[in-house]
Amino acid sequence: MARHSFFCVDGHTCGNPVRLVAGGGPNLNGSTMMEKCAHFLAEYDWIRTGLMFEPRGHDMMSGSILYPPTRPDCDVAVLFIETSGCLPMCGHGTIGTVTMAIEQGLVTPKTPGKLNLDTPAGLVAIEYEQDGQYVERVRLTNVPAFLYAEGLEVECPDLGPIKVDVAYGGNFYAIVEPQENYTDMDDYSALQLIAWSPVLRQRLNEKYKFQHPELPDINRLSHILWTGKPKHPQAHARNAVFYGDKAIDRSPCGTGTSARMAQLAAKGKLKPGDEFIHESIIGSLFHGRVERAAEVAGRPAIVPSIAGWARMTGYNTIFIDDRDPFAHGFSAA
C-alpha cells in the first residue's frame, strides 16, 4: 500500500480556484502536450480525481501540473486538470498558474515579463506585470477562436426550446443569449443554471457534431455560457459558465470570454483592436481584446487576449493514500 504525496500551491483567479501541482506529478510519455494528456488520462487519472474531487477538492476545483515544454518556442508546458477531466486550455487556470509559478520561482522566463506556454491546445503567449515579488496582472494571448455554429435548437428543462450559438475559445461553448424562452442570467438562480446545463450539454452533443477542424482530440461541447446584462459599470457583458458536472465558474472564464469574443466578431460586433470587458457571476472582470483576425482551416477566426489577476491562498501537501477508501475522490449527487 502506497501513500502518494503532492505539493500544491493553492490560489484563485478572480474568485475561481486554481491548484497548481508543483511536486509529485507523474512523468508522461508523448511528443506533444496532447499526447502527454492522453497518457495522463489513461494511466494517472486517479491523480486528477484525487486532487480535484472531495474530500481533497470540491465541485468547482480546477488545477494544473507543470512539465518541461515539448516545443522549443515555449518556456514551460501546462496540463490543465479539473473535475470534468483534462482541458485543452483553461484561461483562468493559465492566469493563476502563471501568477503562482512566477511568484514561487517555479519557472524562469527567457524574457522577463513574457512567457510562452505549451498547452494541449497549442502555444499560449503570456505577458505579465510584476511589482516586486508579486504578479499583479497576466494577459494571455489565446489560441485562435472561432464561431462554430449558429442557432442550434435544443430543448431546455423548464424553459422549453431555445437556440444557442457554439463557439470555440480553447474549448467548445454553447452560448445562450436572451430570446423568447430565456431572458437574462440574473432572472434565474445559480442552482437552476446548474440543473439545466448538463442536460443541455448532453442533448447538444447527442444531436450535433462538434469537431475542431485541426485538433482531432477536441471533439465535444464541454461548457455552457449563459449571458446577461452587465452590472459593473466597466463591463460590456456578463456571463455564468457551467463546467464539469455541477460547477459555475466564479471568474469570467478565459476560454469562454475568448469564445464570446469570437462569436461577436463573427457577427460584426467586434473588430481587431476592440476591447471586451466580461463580468462574472460574482462581479469580477476579465479584460478581453481582439488582437487580430485569423483563420482556422479556412474558417474566419480571431486571436483573442484576456487579462486578469490571481492571488495565492496557501501551500498544501496532499496525500493520496491507498488505504483511504476515498483515495481517488468522490462526488456527492
UniProtKB/Swiss-Prot annotation:
Disulphide bridges, residue numbers: none
Regulation of activity: Inhibited by iodoacetate, iodoacetamide and by high amounts (10 mM) of pyrrole-2-carboxylic acid (PYC). Not inhibited by PYC at 1 mM.
Entry-linked InterPro entries: Pro_racemase_fam (IPR008794)
Residues the record lists as binding substrate: G91, H92, D249, G254, T255
Active site: C90 (proton acceptor), C253 (proton donor)
Catalysis performed (reactions): trans-4-hydroxy-L-proline = cis-4-hydroxy-D-proline
Keywords: Isomerase
Record-listed E.C. numbers: 5.1.1.8
Classification via Pfam families: Pro_racemase (PF05544)
GO molecular function, one term: 4-hydroxyproline epimerase activity
Enzyme class: isomerase
Residue intervals passing through the bilayer: none
Signal peptide: none
Gene3D superfamilies documented for this protein: Diaminopimelate Epimerase, Chain A, domain 1 (3.10.310.10)
NCBIfam families to which the protein is assigned, alphabetical: PRK13971.1
Additional record remark: This enzyme does not require pyridoxal phosphate (PLP) as a cofactor.
Similarity remark: Belongs to the proline racemase family.
Annotated function: Allows intracellular utilization of 4-hydroxyproline, one of the major constituents of host collagen, by converting 4-hydroxy-L-proline to 4-hydroxy-D-proline, which can be further metabolized by intracellular 4-hydroxy-D-proline oxidases. Strong B-cell mitogen. Plays an important role in the regulation of intra- and extracellular amino acid pools, allowing the bacterium to profit from host precursors and enzymatic pathways.
Assembly and oligomerization: Homodimer.
Protein's name in the database: 4-hydroxyproline epimerase
Source organism: Brucella melitensis biotype 1 (strain ATCC 23456 / CCUG 17765 / NCTC 10094 / 16M)
